[in-house]
Amino acid sequence: MGRYIGPLTKVSRRLGVFVGGDIESFQKRNFPPGQHGRTQGRKKLSDYGVRLQEKQKLRFLYGGIREGQFKRYFERASKAAGNTGTVLLQLLERRLDNVVYRLGFAKTRLQARQLVKHGHFLVNGKKVDIPSYELDKGDIIEVREKSKKLEVFKENLESRDPRSVPRWLEIDKDNFRGKVVEIPEEIELEIPVNVQYIIEYYSM
């Protein structure tokens, strides 16, 4: 299965949580597509369906990662030392597009992915245009010199509360630069996700 490129608002409505798209539309119509109003309620899911939904929530939260790629992240996490769920989240958080989003260079992960693919960022002084590029402790991420004049970066940085940047990252707004201070141990997601259900999904 490839990456989903359809309207994320519909995905959010189907999952019942906001993973992207138009937030106002989602809030007004927070019920599954094809359903007329909230009165019908959501269908009760099977055990498999519940676990599939949690996996989809996490996959789409990180910008609609391809199914095959997401499964490979899980396989790496399951073979690594430590808690599988924690390692899975660490791998997702260390993606370049996610770090660009977390630092405030982009308003959404999807926007971050596009900005990375268009070659606007350097990692440790070298251009990297691969959204899934995996960052490590000590890595420096910065906007390329010729891209610093673009309004999108100024607007995004100015609108983002610096307190929203997680502790494992640090941002230097004046120089359009960020740093991975450490590998995150405690990861706060924007929506509730039962990671244990995702582990169980891949074990079914």
Curated annotation (Swiss-Prot):
The gene is rpsD
Task: Tell me the function of this protein.
Answer: One of the primary rRNA binding proteins, it binds directly to 16S rRNA where it nucleates assembly of the body of the 30S subunit.
- Transmembrane portions of the chain: none
Q: Name one Pfam family in it.
A: S4
Q: What binding partners and quaternary form does the record give?
A: Part of the 30S ribosomal subunit. Contacts protein S5. The interaction surface between S4 and S5 is involved in control of translational fidelity.
Q: Which GO terms describe its cellular component?
A: small ribosomal subunit
Biological process (GO), any one: translation
Which family does the record claim for this protein?
A: Belongs to the universal ribosomal protein uS4 family.
Residue span, S4 RNA-binding domain: 94-157
Which GO molecular function entries does the Swiss-Prot or TrEMBL record give?
rRNA binding; structural constituent of ribosome
User: What are the protein's UniProt keywords?
Assistant: Ribonucleoprotein, Ribosomal protein, RNA-binding, rRNA-binding
Keyword Zinc in annotation: no
What is the protein name for this chain?
Answer: Small ribosomal subunit protein uS4
The answer to whether the entry has keyword rRNA-binding is yes
Q: Which PROSITE patterns match?
A: RIBOSOMAL_S4, S4
Q: Which InterPro entries match?
A: Ribosomal_uS4, Ribosomal_uS4_bac-type, Ribosomal_uS4_CS, Ribosomal_uS4_N, S4_RNA-bd, S4_RNA-bd_sf
